[in-house]
Every structure is written in C-alpha cells, then in structure tokens.
C-alpha cells in the first residue's frame, strides 16, 4: 500500500474522530462551562460562557463542513500536503479535546485548539479550492 493511498483513510478517520469529539463536547458542555467559571458565579456569567462555547463549537462545525466538502468532492483527497497537515492537525485536536473534555480545561484553550487544529486545515482547503476552481489547476 503506497503512502498516498494510506493517507486517504487516515485523513478520513482523524477528521471523523475530531468531529465526534466536538459533537460530544457540544452535547455535554455544561461541565466544561463550569470549569471556565469561578466558584461563585452568576447565572449571567454561566450564560455568557455557555454562549461563547456554543459559538466556538459552531464555528468548528462550519470549518468541518469546508474540509469535508473538499475531501469528499475529491478536490483535495489525493493532495499529499493537505492530507499530512489534516491528519496531524486533527489527530492533535482529538487528543487535545479529549483532555479538554475529561480534565475540564478552561474555555479559552478551546479557541487555541480550534485555530491551530481546525482553522488552519480549513484555510489550506480553501486555498486548494481557489487553485482548482479559480485558477483551473489540477487538484494534485
């Protein structure tokens, strides 16, 4: 099995694992919101932090849509650079978000995880979209 053909399933699996963890955090975000608050908090503070986490998770889901669109349409499926970046970023995000979920990390750390592990691959995916559809280059 060549390296490029093993990158395709690896990319799909890490992307899907990251998506599953984000959805899990979305469903059970109350504990993470409580970890972001001081011991004595007001309902307004809870609502504010909950809204912040909902926005961050929603942006992440939008970035997943971009990356799945490029991957499943075949535009970047066999691009080695994008596949390696995506596998590394989403594997890192999977491990980091597991710690975020189970250790109750602060909510501000989620923005860092999202920017490096979700936004970076999505931006490179958009660049590949522009190169393929705008400049009519081959997807490889």
From Swiss-Prot:
GO terms for biological process: non-motile cilium assembly; protein localization to ciliary transition zone. This is Transmembrane protein 107. Glycans are attached at residue 79. It comes from the Eukaryota. It is a multi-pass membrane protein. The lineage of its organism: Eukaryota, Metazoa, Chordata, Craniata, Vertebrata. The chain crosses the membrane at residues 7-27, 53-73, 84-104, 113-133. May play a role in cilia formation and embryonic patterning. InterPro entries: TMEM107 (IPR029248). It is found in: Membrane. Keywords: Cilium biogenesis/degradation, Developmental protein, Glycoprotein, Membrane, Transmembrane, Transmembrane helix. One of its GO terms (cellular component) is membrane. PANTHER family: TRANSMEMBRANE PROTEIN 107 (PTHR34341:SF1). The gene is tmem107.
